Amino acid sequence: ADNVMSARLALVVLPTVAFVGRLFPNLTVQGLGDPNYAYSLLKQYKGEWEFDTNWKMIFGHPKKAGWIKAIQEAQQTVQKGLKLDCPILVMSSNKSFPETETWHEEYMTSDIVLDVQDIQKYGEKLGDKVTRDTIPNGIHDLILSQKPYRNDAYQTIFEWLKKQ
């Protein structure tokens, strides 16, 4: 029920924020987010990686109305179809999980940033030479997934490249 309400709310809020972004692109519309994605990556918490948290901040970055506008416009363009004339590999995790304030182990094996069904659905509309694949237990940044799933992502990429 929460996911359905969030989706309905997004249908109203995102276009409104995008419109505001035309007039006030630098207006902050969302402050810092939850740290769970960073926790799933960083070695000092639950992950395998070390990185500069000044560049990839633990709580994300403040979202500006102009940024939301640009993303919404880009997503609408992709959803209509791009007709790119080149081989394209669309990859995602095999599952999404909603990020909340509370830590869940599913964050380690799910995309908690984007809806993987949308990635696969709209990825097909990028062009006529699209190959789609899912990586079981991959995270949003597939190459930063836990080692076994990261290896699956690399194998998928290299096998696809050999066929090109």
Name every feature range the model reports, one short phrase each.
Residues A1-K63:
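Alpha/beta-hydrolase-fold enzymes
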Residues N3-S6, K95-E99:
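Short glycine-rich His-centered loop
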Residues V12, Q76-K83, L89:
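Alpha/beta-hydrolase superfamily serine-hydrolase fold, recognizing
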Residues D34, A70, Q164:
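A hydrolase-biased, glycine/serine/histidine/acidic-enriched motif that marks catalytic-domain neighborhoods
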Residues F59-G81:
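Active-site nucleophile elbow and catalytic-triad environment of alpha/beta-hydrolase enzymes
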Residues L84, V90-S92, Y107:
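Short beta-strand/loop motif that positions the catalytic acidic residue
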Residues F97-T134:
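Conserved loop-alpha-helix segment in the C-terminal half of the alpha/beta-hydrolase fold
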Residues Q120, L126-Q164:
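Catalytic active-site module of serine/aspartate enzymes centered on a nucleophile-bearing elbow/loop
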